[in-house]
Structures are given as structure tokens and as C-alpha cells.
Amino acid sequence: MSSRVELPVPVEVDAPAAQVWAYVTDWERQGEWMLGTRVRVTGGDGRGAGTTLHAVTGVGPLGVPDTMEVVEFVEPTDATPGRAAVRHTGKIIRGDGYFEVVPLGPHRCRFTFTELIDLPLGALGRLGWPLARPVLKAGFVVSLRRMADRCAAAYRAADGP
């Protein structure tokens, strides 16, 4: 087994791609929908490549630091997908993460969150991955559903179909 693993999680959202993009790439609001995560922008404007981020993932005072750099930032149009890529640069969390927003018409889109994780702890990390994967995936599914519900509710309240 390689020490790099992939974990993609898609969700369909009843809101336009541009609205979903604006919400998911508002890095400091990520804690509103991503379980156990707090993020702050540490460099750049947060709206493009070169932005640096510091996140803490955990419960209460117990958390794992996660430093990142945005290496790609392409906003969606009505017809083309948007994509943001971050490189995890921390001591524990390393790898790449991707947000992709694909328009499915004027009022709907698909958001896919993908992590390409470099497993820590060598052989122990590889042995533990089959146990950790379903837990991480379940957390991401809950988080993405929360994000989708928030975006859909905001769209309906503002000017939805």
C-alpha cells in the first residue's frame, strides 16, 4: 500500500455554482460547516493562489495543526467548473486537497472535496488507514451535507427559483 491515499467526497447542492464557490472558499467560515475545523488566512487575500492558511482540526483544546498554501484557484462560470487546490505543508497533515464546483444548471451544482493524504507514521499509518478511512469519510459526508443545506437555504431565502 502506498503512503498516499485518496478520499473523494461529492455532494449535490441546490444552489448556483458561484454561490457555493463563494461560501466554500471563504476559508475563515469553513468552521461553520466542516466538523471540528477552525481556519484563518495567514497570508494573501484568501482569493487566489499564494494564499496561506492555518487550520486546527479537533475537538475543544485538542487539535492537530494544518498549514496550507493555496496553489490553484479557478472560479467557476455558468458553464465551467471551479477548482481550488491546497498543499498541506504541516508536520502531521501533508498532501493535497481539492475543492471542485461543477455547474449542473443555473440553480444546482456538484461540490467534490478530495483529499490526497500522505499517511503519517509509516507502516503504522498504512495499517491504520482502513480503520481511519470510514471515520474520516463519514465526517466529510456530514460536513458536506451541512454545507449543501446552508447554501441551499441561503439561496432560497435570497432569490432562489
Where in this protein do the model-derived segments appear?
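Residue-level detector of alpha-helix boundaries and kinks
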Residues: V5, A15, A55, V86, ...
